[in-house]
């Protein structure tokens, strides 16, 4: 059994499509997969990341906890809605209930690693420590990514959360000079597990499955579950 938290260097970097792609690749490798998104914001505009994972990857074991209408950071979205954030033990219990032998459990955060997900001030990093998870970091290939990536990795290391690698959430075609340079530099910081093509979320399920299988190394995916 393996719990992998999927975090990112910020909002809009492609965490959901990466969750879906890794889930699809794992399922094609014969691995049982569950996906958890403890906190979802932006529901008033139709944001539903778990439904997107289900549509793209065919995962049926999907679990969420708190949903807030406005597309804001969870604490701000909760305050705006007159609601509370979940408690730390609620999130931990949600994840623990999914975890089982032979299963890969993916836990998608909201925004970046240190965004508050639970009261008081609990972040995805704290949850990762609680459930003994490793982290996959979704990054961009844009200017600023090297600094943002290093800051995220330093924050993980500060609490002894292992990094399973990086995934570029949206890889342009063709890549420009900056993207190509940053991809090489990112690979010197940590292992780049995949670079998903820009617009991958718009693919149908069949094309998405083929893309996902090609994007990730099958041996690495198979080795995620011991």
From Swiss-Prot:
One cellular-component annotation, GO: cytosol
Cofactor (UniProt): Mg(2+)
Listed name of the protein: ATP-dependent dethiobiotin synthetase BioD
Enzyme category, top tier: ligase
Amino-acid positions noted as binding substrate in the UniProt annotation, renumbered to this chain: 41
SUPFAM superfamilies reported for this sequence: P-loop containing nucleoside triphosphate hydrolases
Subunit structure comment from the entry: Homodimer.
Organism annotation: Mycobacterium bovis (strain BCG / Pasteur 1173P2)
One GO term (biological process): biotin biosynthetic process
One MF term in the entry's GO annotations: ATP binding
Active-site feature positions: 37
Location in or out of the cell: Cytoplasm
Function of the protein: Catalyzes a mechanistically unusual reaction, the ATP-dependent insertion of CO2 between the N7 and N8 nitrogen atoms of 7,8-diaminopelargonic acid (DAPA, also called 7,8-diammoniononanoate) to form a ureido ring.
Residues where Mg(2+) binds: 16, 49, 108
EC number(s) reported in the record: 6.3.3.3
